[in-house]
């Protein structure tokens, strides 16, 4: 998503453990970490910002591990949509309506779910009036219900 930072996994070893694929036209700005470190020494406010970014990434990764380990399929998809809404809001975009750039299969791969499970869960959310789905166009009708699904101890 625009404005996001990738590649923090390669800071220690210089090798990245994963790859990224742009789902739409994108621009990438490559900045070697040693250059960022040098600039951070000159500008302490930059160092503080870099630490915040790294901390946010640690929290996100931890959340992803919890998601894959402890959440049901419904909770995973609800969490995915809530997270997407929050990221769109942070960029000044609509939280209630958006085009889903990932296919159902890609979402399943990301969430550790089968394509059929993702499709079935989207249909369930649609039937329950939580979201409206027209191919990749998603309209969030009940964001509070989605958030409750993520927090539900026994979402079935």
Annotated model-derived regions:
Residues 1-59, 63:
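Cyclic-nucleotide recognition modules
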Residues 41, 45-114:
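Polybasic "coupling" helices that flank or enter modular domains
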Residues 86-156:
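Phosphate-/nucleic-acid-contacting segments
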Residues 4, 21, 29, 75, ...:
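Residues that recognize and position ribonucleotide moieties
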Residues 2, 7-13, 38, 67-70, ...:
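Generic structural "secondary-structure junction" signal
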């Amino acid at each position: 998503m625009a404005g996001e930072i990738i590649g923090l996994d390669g800071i220690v070893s210089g090798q990245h453990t994963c790859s990224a694929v742009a789902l739409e036209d994108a621009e990438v700005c490559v900045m070697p970490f040693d250059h960022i470190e040098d600039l951070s020494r000159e500008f302490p406010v930059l160092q503080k910002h870099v630490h915040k970014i790294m901390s946010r990434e640690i929290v996100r990764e931890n959340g992803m591990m919890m998601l894959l380990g402890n959440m049901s399929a419904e909770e995973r998809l609800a969490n995915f949509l809530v997270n997407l809404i929050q990221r769109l809001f942070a960029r000044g975009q609509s939280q209630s309506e958006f085009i889903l750039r990932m296919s159902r299969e890609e979402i399943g791969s990301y969430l550790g779910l089968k394509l059929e499970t993702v499709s079935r869960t989207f249909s369930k959310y649609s039937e329950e009036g939580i979201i409206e789905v027209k191919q990749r166009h998603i309209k969030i009708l009940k964001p509070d219900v989605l958030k409750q699904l993520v927090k539900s101890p026994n979402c079935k």
